[in-house]
């Protein structure tokens, strides 16, 4: 397997995992304000 492919897969999984987390944090901050 190519290291570039692994890096792309890793970044994709990171984005899919952190995406909802960041959105949740933004919503919580808006709710507090």
From Swiss-Prot:
Main location per the UniProt record: plastid
UniProtKB keywords: Chloroplast, Membrane, Photosynthesis, Photosystem II, Plastid, Thylakoid, Transmembrane, Transmembrane helix
Domain of life: Eukaryota
Ranges that cross the membrane: 7-27
Any matching Pfam family: PSII_Ycf12
Any one Gene Ontology cellular component term annotated for this protein: chloroplast thylakoid membrane
Topology of this chain in the membrane: Single-pass membrane protein
Biological processes annotated in GO: photosynthesis
HAMAP family linked: PSII_Psb30_Ycf12
NCBIfam families attached to this UniProt entry: PRK13686.1
Assembly and oligomerization: PSII is composed of 1 copy each of membrane proteins PsbA, PsbB, PsbC, PsbD, PsbE, PsbF, PsbH, PsbI, PsbJ, PsbK, PsbL, PsbM, PsbT, PsbY, PsbZ, Psb30/Ycf12, peripheral proteins of the oxygen-evolving complex and a large number of cofactors. It forms dimeric complexes.
Protein name, UniProt field: Photosystem II reaction center protein Psb30
Organism field: Euglena gracilis
Gene responsible for this protein: psb30
């Amino acid at each position: 397997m190519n290291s570039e492919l692994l890096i792309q897969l890793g970044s994709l999984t990171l984005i899919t995992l952190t995406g909802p987390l960041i959105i949740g944090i933004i919503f919580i901050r808006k709710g507090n304000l």
